[in-house]
A protein has these predicted regions:
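Extreme N-terminal starter segment of soluble prokaryotic enzymes
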Residues: 1-7
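Residue-level signal for short segments within beta-strands and strand-turn junctions
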Residues: 9, 98, 206-208
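Cys-nucleophile CN-hydrolase/nitrilase-fold catalytic domain and related Cys-dependent amidase chemistry
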Residues: 13, 17-21, 25-100, 106, ...
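Short, charged, solvent-exposed linker or helix-capping segments at domain edges/interfaces
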Residues: 17, 59-62, 105, 213-216, ...
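Structural motif
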Residues: 37-38, 137, 161
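CN hydrolase (nitrilase-like) catalytic-core segments centered on the catalytic cysteine
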Residues: 61-79, 146-233
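Active-site catalytic loop in hydrolytic enzyme cores
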Residues: 85-157, 166, 172-180, 187, ...
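C-terminal beta-strand edge segments of enzyme domains
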Residues: 129-131, 194-277
Length: 277
């Protein structure tokens, strides 16, 4: 079974939900023509990454109706991203829409960038996994991927593929980290980032890092340049990935969880203390 992800590398417009939705539908159609199973958008694509949006102006699930209808019509999935209504403040969220137009999952970004303007958002409280057409999908949004715990929890919850809506620059260390997340969790990873100078580099990595003869293989399935806008594709061989996961020693095979209690401490020590504004 091949699970094909269409990765959109493009920047959307701020506060232009209708126009951005038309762009999404255009690329959903192109993704379907190219036999993709799902279209992955960059972070906050529907609304734009406009942190002046208040909770009243943020979108809700009802605003996804046209995209759900198009997903059903085309038979292609979508990871839709937007600033959405939270309990008191907006959330940075992703919705996984299935091929029949159903919303399979909403995930709100847990690791909001509290060192920057994103501190005004309401963070999510859990990592989530859903079943998409027989493939277990987890979501990390941008800064989530800087914390290995994010991908590890998704793996523990059964994720086989982790999709990453993203919006940032200086991508080289982030690419290395995403490849490592794929390797250490034995999960496929795909990331969509807006194009631009020092940006872009949308990517995908297989968890398969060596062959049956223990020879290293390049696990890069996709690595876009910085400035090209448009769709890129990554094909995950789920049969090969599942066989690899059944025999190799990463993931949840030999963890020593009794030694991990310090991971649950919320104490922050030097040199990691920061002022909280």
């Amino acid at each position: 079974m091949i699970f094909k992800v269409a990765v959109l590398q493009m920047r959307s417009e701020n506060r232009a939900v209708e126009e951005n939705s038309k762009t999404i539908i255009k690329y959903m159609t192109e993704a379907k023509i190219n036999n993709a199973d799902i279209l992955l958008l960059p972070e906050c694509f529907m609304t734009g990454y406009d942190l002046t949006i208040n909770n009243d102006a943020a979108i809700s699930e009802s605003d996804l109706a046209s995209l759900c209808d198009k997903a059903k019509e085309l038979g292609v999935g979508l990871v839709a991203t937007a600033l959405t209504k939270g309990n008191a403040k907006p959330q940075n969220a992703a919705f996984v829409i299935g091929k029949h137009g159903e919303i399979l999952m909403k995930y709100a970004k847990v690791h909001t960038c509290d060192f920057a303007d994103e501190r005004v958002l309401e963070p999510g409280t859990e990592f989530r996994v859903c079943d998409f057409d027989g493939v277990k999908i987890g979501i990390m949004i941008c800064y989530d991927r800087e914390y290995p715990e994010s991908a590890r929890i998704l793996m523990l919850k059964g994720a086989e593929i982790i999709l990453v809506p993203n919006d940032c620059v200086s991508m080289r260390p982030r690419l290395q980290a995403l490849s490592t997340r794929a390797y250490e969790n034995m999960c496929g990873v795909a990331m969509a980032n807006p194009n631009g100078k020092n940006a872009g580099n949308s990517c995908a990595y297989s968890p398969i890092c060596w062959d049956d003869n223990d020879e290293c293989v390049d696990n890069t399935l996709l690595l876009a340049d910085a400035e090209t806008a448009g769709l890129f594709y990554a094909a995950f061989d789920m049969g090969a990935i599942r066989q690899y996961r059944e025999r190799e020693m990463m993931g949840n095979t030999f963890r020593k969880v009794k030694a991990y209690s310090d991971l649950l401490s919320d104490e922050i020590q030097y040199p990691f203390k920061r002022s909280r504004k």
